Amino acid sequence: MYTMGLDIGSTASKGVILKNGEDIVASETISSGTGTTGPSRVLEKLYGKTGLAREDIKKVVVTGYGRMNYSDADKQISELSCHARGVNFIIPETRTIIDIGGQDAKVLKLDNNGRLLNFLMNDKCAAGTGRFLDVMAKIIEVDVSELGSISMNSQNEVSISSTCTVFAESEVISHLSENAKIEDIVAGIHTSVAKRVSSLVKRIGVQRNVVMVGGVARNSGIVRAMAREINTEIIVPDIPQLTGALGAALYAFDEAKESQKEVKNI
């Protein structure tokens, strides 16, 4: 039995096809989110990889920022529930999830069974999000994917004290004019993000294991800065961007099983 989970975010679209609720047979990430061709391109890639068609997929669950704009799904489920389900499937001992997305940052607290107990979110300001990193990368003229490796060479991290993106831009430009090293500026940017997000973690309560997901989790500099700020090791799964889509695919499997039961009872 095949089920599918789609996670349509603000800046990326992700998809997972699951077999029998256990095996990931295909996954895909496209750097285009809601309101773009991203979701349809994810489907095209997934079907191309597997040779499957829509009629072969028993159930589809969609999650993410753009879930309500996607009509060809059997159910919409919040990204909070889907990330909790997906992460718990990969790392059952997880108690805290840090999810830094393109437009917001979320911290989730799970119980011993992987169920969502509580969450906090920062969605009022770009600082502390992937968007903030995109803006900063453009200012210092590097690709955002290179920030993590660049920051690892820092020996004299500069301070980025502003919590507002506009003022932080001015600080970075000032550091550049003072000939600060790029790696030291990037390290300061990472610490700025980590401080903002770690305040959410501390408010909700740090419980190990702590797992970080989302595209920003691929940035080793951010992960290191976050671990330092909360004084706890952070685990990054092999598929940090896909945990929401995976959780959605698992919920889709639940839906498919329930449908089978209903058919048998007729």
Curated annotation (Swiss-Prot):
Question: Which UniProt key words apply to this protein?
Answer: 4Fe-4S, ATP-binding, Hydrolase, Iron, Iron-sulfur, Metal-binding, Nucleotide-binding, Plasmid
Q: Which residues bind [4Fe-4S] cluster?
A: 125, 164
Record text on cofactor binding: Binds 1 [4Fe-4S] cluster per dimer.
E.C. number(s) listed in UniProt: 3.-.-.-
Matching entries from CDD domains are given as: ASKHA_NBD_HgdC_HadI-like (cd24103)
List ligand-binding residues for ATP: 10-14, 102-104, 134, 215, 241
Q: Answer whether the UniProt record assigns the keyword ATP-binding to this protein.
A: yes
| GO biological process terms, semicolon-separated | L-leucine metabolic process
Q: Output the Gene Ontology terms for molecular function.
A: 4 iron, 4 sulfur cluster binding; ATP binding; hydrolase activity; metal ion binding
Name the domain of life this protein comes from: Bacteria
Q: What does this protein do?
A: Involved in the reductive branch of L-leucine fermentation. Required for the activation of (R)-2-hydroxyisocaproyl-CoA dehydratase. The reduced activator transfers one electron to the dehydratase concomitant with hydrolysis of ATP. This protein is extremely sensitive towards oxygen.
The record's annotation in PANTHER family points to: BIFUNCTIONAL PROTEIN [INCLUDES 2-HYDROXYACYL-COA DEHYDRATASE (N-TER) AND ITS ACTIVATOR DOMAIN (C_TERM), BIFUNCTIONAL PROTEIN [INCLUDES 2-HYDROXYACYL-COA DEHYDRATASE (N-TER) AND ITS ACTIVATOR DOMAIN (C_TERM)-RELATED
Annotated NCBIfam families = CoA_E_activ
- Subunit structure, as described in the record: Homodimer.
Task: Describe the family membership recorded for this protein in Swiss-Prot or TrEMBL.
Answer: Belongs to the HadI activator family.
Protein name, per record: 2-hydroxyisocaproyl-CoA dehydratase activator
